[in-house]
Amino acid sequence: MKRERIRRRVAALDTSNQIALFGQAPASIPEARPGADSPRKQAPRFEEPDPRLIRINEQRLDQLLEQVGQHAPLKIRAWLGQMCFSEFEQAYPPGGRPAYAPRAMLGVILCGIMQGISSLRELERFARTDLGCWWVSGAIMPDHSILGRFIQRHGGLLSEQFFDQLTHKVLKLTGSGTGVVAGDGTVIEAAASRYRQMRAEALAQALQAAREAAQGEAEAGARVEQLQRAQSILDSRREEREARGKDASGLSINAREPEAVVQPQKDKQRYAASYKPSVLANDKRVIVAAQVHASSETAVVEQLLDQAQGQGKIDTALFDAGYFATDVIVATAKRHIELLCPEGQSQGSDWNKHSDKRLPKSGFDYHAEEDCYRCPAGQRLSAVGCYKGNASAPAYTEYATRACAGCALRERCTRSAQGRRIKRYAIDAHKDALRAKMAQPQARQRYAQRQAMVEPVFSTLRHRQGLQRFRRNGLAAVRVEFALHAMAYNLSRALAQLFARFINGLLTHGHPSLRKVAALLSHAVVAMSLQRGSTLCSAALHAR
């Protein structure tokens, strides 16, 4: 049987514009004009849903929040909408899948912290279940890893530029400034187990064991690097302590969190690896500056003052007796800021409370015209020598007397066979002037407002925002975490001030029946949390 031939269509190709492999190329190829048909540079895209499109039972979400008296989320979203996030957006590359908008991400984090939620997994659950958070963020639902990467990527902005921007906004909302600020600090435990604290001997043994097990194992090698870093930090701390003439044999460190210092906690009953955050607050209890140091509250005073002066001029700074130090006096004098700070552990009417076991240096009166000291027993201490000082130790003049042998106060004054000796430094003239100022009734009265300005700040951070312990490792990460808590606290203060203004309006211009209600609310709000106060503020604004 003869097969039929299959006929296929043959396509004719136009080869007139083609060039042979070894043929002669055209003399020139026309260049495209720059920018004519070139693709434009893509800007990063962000996912920021409109919460006005969210409906629950055919009712808009904002209407539902107003109906139940939850106006705080409405206010927070409006305030965040007035902030600038361009620096955040510049950190994202163009193209690809749209990222969650920085405004929405920060709304989730701050709203959660205001309600005492700071764990990343708890924030993930909060973003999925809280209606107020839906309105602030547009109902985005990031998981804990996305939240963690956002904080890590923008840590520098969150703790510096954006903190200053939000603080400026809150100062305008509260109608307050930085004329008078009060400073304080506390100690907060680090994210490290107290059972992993090691002294120098145990650390050396652990490092030796890790080195023996590190042959060919990447994880063991990382452990060696961690222990080496901890040993280096511990050695530097021991050298610094010995240079000051103190015993360093009892120093310990946590290898998992070596930047944290093992120090006594607030209850004075235990030691743990921890950090010391410090703040400056104004008369409306708004945090105008926040810093964190590993072990010192006075070491960050200069940074606090500079950060606060970025918001406005500081006239007076109030610090407790723990800040009666050279660094603080010099920092305030250099910036022409009036300092009110007592010496010793001032409590009640006793402004210079010291231990009865030893007479302090402040109990000796210096007489500049005679260049001598007078001790509490009336004896004269004359200059017996001078020290010129060096790069590590300041110069001083030493004063002494031979009348200590038969003095009735010797047991309380000195145990030295040579008698009591007083060293006078250049800074002592400023300390004497500060003591004289704090002895005046007007200065005491002005200083008395410090406790109400700054003491409630850390109480709120600990008990209302859940800052009993840091969750991130390393000093840099801890600073970012504390800045987030400070920003959430400031938003709560702005909401509380709105509530206070509404109550004052009712007390001044309201109907007599409304005045009674306002009086009851003003007494009740003292015992309420800021979260509850924000809700009352929302209800008050709605009623108005």
Protein language model regions, located:
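Basic, short loop/linker segments at the boundary and entry of helix-turn-helix/winged-helix-like folds
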Residues: 65-110, 115, 426-430
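Anion-binding and metal-coordination hotspots
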Residues: 2-8, 12-25, 42, 46, ...
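Short arginine-rich
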Residues: 134-138
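Short, low-complexity intrinsically disordered segments
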Residues: 77, 132-133, 349
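Hydrophobic alpha-helical membrane-insertion signals
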Residues: 11-70
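Short N-terminal secondary-structure initiator segments
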Residues: 23-44, 72-91, 222-232
